[in-house]
Swiss-Prot record:
GO BP field: viral tail assembly
Source species of the chain: Escherichia phage lambda
Gene (name only): I
Keyword Transport applies: no
Protein name: Tail tip assembly protein I
Purpose of the protein: Plays a role in distal tail tip complex assembly. The tail tip complex is assembled successively with three tail tip proteins J, one tail tip protein I, one tail tip protein L and one tail tip protein K. The tail tip complex interacts with tail measure protein to initiate tail tube assembly. The formation of the tail tip complex is completed by the addition of tail tip protein M, which is followed by tail tube polymerization. May be excluded form tail tip during maturation and would be absent from virions.
Length: 223
């Protein structure tokens, strides 16, 4: 009995990516043969580094096959199998609109991270791996937490380090003269010998006032 040695090589259907606003510099309509929205974004981000950078800098409304992508279901929706002829819309939106409510908007950097999250694996494959054993599920959960935690860390603002010229309230340190003569806590204090021709660095200070009409009582108003 003859055996046929063939592989199922069914190619994915065509999908159209429609870009709007500033993203149109990379093309208005781009047709790609992809299986998921994640593959489409990943393909554009890989071939167009400037597109990846631009998408990472703002908020966008992403609509895949007639459904808006939400922040909570971002990764799942990006990895859903697309119907043939699906259209993906990526529309720039202002950041303040995320609390509006007519449509969902997502952070572009999160969309990029979600597209590269499973490295091309489908959600069905991940589900099978998780169902294979409890330890596999635990490892997957830990890995997902590390990846998403890293994304959150990249998006979080960096703490400002203290500067010699400014105090914690952001104002210039000129308490005693027009020269900078105060230093924020934790900064280096120079040790000078001989005659100084530079501004001083006051370690501590106290400002007080005397009320001459009340027996010369000294009232401390700043320290």
């Amino acid at each position: 009995m003859a055996a046929t040695h063939t592989l199922p090589l069914a190619s994915p259907g065509m999908a159209r990516i429609c870009l709007y606003g500033d993203l149109q510099r990379f093309g208005r309509r781009i047709d790609l043969r992809v299986k998921t929205g994640a593959e489409a974004i990943r393909a554009l981000a890989t071939q167009l580094p400037a597109f990846r950078q631009k998408l990472s800098d703002g908020w966008y409304q992403v609509r895949i096959a007639g459904r808006d992508v939400s922040t909570s279901g971002l990764t799942a929706q990006l990895h859903e199998t697309l119907p043939d002829g699906a259209v993906i819309h990526i529309v720039p939106r202002v950041a303040g609109a995320k609390s509006g409510g007519v449509f969902q908007i997502v952070l572009g950097a999160a969309a990029i991270a979600g597209s590269f999250f499973t490295a091309g694996a489908t959600l069905a494959a991940w589900g099978a791996a998780i169902g294979a054993g409890g330890m596999t599920g635990i490892l997957f959960s830990l890995g997902a937490s590390m990846v998403l935690g890293g994304v959150a860390q990249m998006l979080a603002p960096k703490a400002r380090t203290p500067r010699i010229q400014t105090t914690d309230n952001g104002k210039q340190n000129t308490y005693f003269s027009s020269l900078d003569n105060m230093v924020a806590q934790g900064n280096v204090l120079p040790v000078l010998y001989g005659e100084m021709r530079v501004g001083s660095r006051v370690v501590s200070q106290e400002i007080s006032t005397a009320d001459e009409g009340d027996g010369g009582q000294v009232v401390v108003i700043g320290r």
